Amino acid sequence: LCVVGDEAKIDVIVENHGGLSSNGKWLAGTLKKVAHPRCGALPDFGNFRIDEKEQYDRYQGVDELMPFARGVSAKSHDFDERGEEIHTDFHRMLELVVGKHGWRGFVGIEYEGGKLSEEDGIQATRTLLERVRDELTAKLEAAKAADGAAGAGKAEGGGK
């Protein structure tokens, strides 16, 4: 499939979506063995159910799949009164995706809840993503400013 994709200049991506594909370690290992430049992953925040009895850790799974990511899917189901997704800690997830792995591409939105309309669920997810993005940006800028101030202090006092 990747050979055909290569000829057409199309990436072939695999989403964790139940069964073995929801085992992040297994899927990452499979993608590593394929070792084709057109083969990648679409880590989905909410698809880590291996079977009826086994759930794979979503944060570990996304972490394992991000080196192969060609896109990211922010799946949501339900929100609390503060607008936080109750099944996935979006702050923790985006720290992994954006912070640790440096993702700068698109983040798709999937709403699969039943309490909001599809449109309202998508909007609630977008609002949450934008809020977390702004918080992460502010945190990064504060860290850069602190590093800059520390560096300036060293430069001023460095000759003593």
For each predicted feature, which ranges?
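Structural motif
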Residues: 15-17
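Histidine/acidic residue-rich metal-binding segments in metalloenzymes
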Residues: 2
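Histidine-acidic metal/acid-base catalytic patches
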Residues: 7-9, 20-160
